[in-house]
Curated annotation (Swiss-Prot):
Gene Ontology annotations of biological process type: gluconeogenesis; glucose 6-phosphate metabolic process; glycolytic process
EC number(s) recorded for this UniProt protein: 5.3.1.9
Organism: Xanthomonas oryzae pv. oryzae (strain MAFF 311018)
Cellular compartments annotated: Cytoplasm
Protein name: Glucose-6-phosphate isomerase
CDD domains in UniProt: SIS_PGI_1, SIS_PGI_2
Keywords on record: Cytoplasm, Gluconeogenesis, Glycolysis, Isomerase
GO molecular function list: carbohydrate derivative binding; glucose-6-phosphate isomerase activity; monosaccharide binding
Gene Ontology CC terms: cytosol
Length: 504
């Protein structure tokens, strides 16, 4: 990005604004609270407390045009091979809508709709049995997305099926889950793109044995033959996914099977509708009015121009407590790259470390560092305008904390006692859902997906591969024989010492 024609001008704006007080920016642009705010369907965004002004934004948009960001969106939605290292499309958007006239995207949309119809039929069959509980086994993209949505949207009471998620290879996770269940009234779903994932295969074997066979086992995989063979699952109970959908973008596919079981098939379809509506905004809205673009450019500005190494996400709705963990994978696995599309080294820092938690709990853990620490941490505050629980006073208090914390972070407060002084100047974006509905959550997740893509285009990297996860897995497989005492051929001296400790 530093090699673009407009970078010097952008850098000059950063130098000008780095030490600017956020109240001074608001004073200089009196209409800023509304001019930097956007309503897109059920989502409201306010960027007024970010440390840029109109001139800096114009410079950011100029670089976005130089990087052909609008064309990049077209290539993504039309099914071109934007995943250049694996020579694949990234058509997660086709799982939820058909927004272009590109034949490949339309074909993928039709294929996904057919599989979704099959999934709906399987759900009807399951609901007609005496099964009360579902154990969903997967990891990474096969777990984080479904777990987030199921937890956020599950009914408070009266659910026909209870869905439990197991991901960690640690046997304690499976033991604790199965201890509360009856195998005669439980079904299992094994989700793995390749069906070669160690965690899913080991946990799947435990679940298969505990259930007494495969009669109530289902699978979702891009390798359905291997899935059926590995656990003797009838082909009719195996749902496909495809190599044109990355794992962390797959909750909209049959990977969402446990979501639909937890919240109902109709509400699962509403989730997809909400995502498709935001997709249309991302694809068709001019850059300067495009919220996904502005969110992504804001992340680039904070990372590359203001030097922020981390980004916090605070969800002021307990039902969204798992969103920071989901975004951690979505953002860091997509953008944690050090080479560009052509294999050359990047010319600027890429992804920030994303982290966070649920408010107001986090105010009593890490907010001390946000307010008075030496690192400036940009943040997203996410809340809901309307809540459907019966405790209205609690919701008012919750939203009061959103308003108070964002104001305090931005404005700070002087004191004659340095220990009680707040420097301010901490930027944040506020995102408000009209209510936590399937449509709103679908739109929110879609926004973050597109923000990630914007950042990848600005940096010239591939958001859709994840080769960085492979080496550790390969070494773990090689070390298994040594841990079992079958081999002692380990080259690394520290690993040898640790093995001796583990083997006693």
């Amino acid at each position: 990005m530093t090699q673009t024609n407009g970078f010097d001008a952008l850098h000059a704006h950063a130098q000008r604004l780095r030490g600017a007080a956020i109240p001074a920016l608001l004073a200089a642009e009196p209409e800023r609270p509304t001019q930097y705010a956007w309503q897109v369907g059920p989502l409201y965004f306010n960027f007024a407390r970010q440390k840029y002004d109109r001139a800096a934004l114009d410079a950011l948009f100029a670089i976005a045009r130089e990087r052909d960001l609008a064309g990049a969106f077209q290539r993504l939605f039309r099914g071109e091979q934007v995943n250049v290292t694996e020579q694949r499309a990234a058509l997660h958007t086709a799982l939820r809508g058909d927004l272009t006239d590109a034949p490949v995207a339309s074909e993928c949309y039709a294929t996904a709709a057919e599989v979704r119809e099959r999934m709906g039929a399987l759900i009807q069959q399951l609901e007609a049995t005496d099964v009360t509980d579902i154990v969903s086994v997967g990891i990474g993209g096969s777990d984080l997305g479904p777990r987030l949505v199921a937890d956020a949207l599950r009914p408070v009471s009266g659910a026909r099926l209870r869905v439990h998620f197991v991901s960690n290879v640690d046997g304690a996770a499976m033991q604790r889950t199965l201890a509360t269940l009856d195998p005669a009234r439980t079904a299992g779903i094994l989700i793995s793109k390749t069906f070669g994932t160690q965690e899913t295969l080991l946990n799947g074997s435990i679940l298969h044995a505990w259930l007494g066979g495969s009669e109530r086992l289902y699978a979702v995989s891009a390798n359905p033959e291997r899935a059926a063979k590995a656990f003797d699952i009838a082909p009719g109970r195996v749902l496909p996914m495809w190599d044109w959908v990355g794992g962390r973008y797959s909750l909209w596919s049959a990977v969402g099977f446990p979501i639909a079981l937890a919240i109902g098939f109709e509400r699962f379809e509403q989730l997809l509708e909400g995502a498709a509506q935001f997709d249309a905004h991302a694809l068709n809205t001019p850059l300067e009015e495009n919220v996904a673009v502005l969110h992504g450019l804001t992340a680039v500005w904070n990372r590359n121009l203001l030097g922020s190494a981390t980004h916090a996400v605070m969800t002021y709705d307990q039902r969204l407590a798992l969103l920071p963990a989901y975004l951690q994978q979505l953002v860091m696995e997509s953008l944690g790259k050090r080479v560009k599309l052509d294999g050359s080294a990047v010319d600027s820092d890429t992804v920030s470390v994303w982290w966070g938690g649920a408010g107001t709990d986090v105010q009593h853990s890490f907010f001390q560092a946000l307010h008075q620490g030496t690192s400036v941490v940009p943040a997203d505050f996410i809340g809901t305008v309307h809540n459907d629980d019966p405790y209205a006073e609690n919701h008012v208090a919750l939203m009061a904390n959103v308003l108070a914390q964002t104001e305090a972070l931005a404005n700070g407060q002087d004191s004659s006692d340095p220990h009680r002084s707040y420097p301010g100047g901490r930027p944040s974006t506020v995102i408000l859902l009209d209510a936590l509905t399937p449509q709103a959550l679908g739109a929110l997740i879609s926004m973050y997906e597109h923000s990630v893509y914007v950042q990848s285009v600005m940096w010239g990297i591939n958001a859709f591969d994840q080769f960085g996860v492979e080496l550790g897995k390969q070494l773990a497989s090689q070390l298994l024989p040594a841990l079992k005492g079958e081999s002692a051929d380990v080259a690394d001296p520290v690993t040898r010492e640790l093995l001796s400790k583990l083997r006693g």
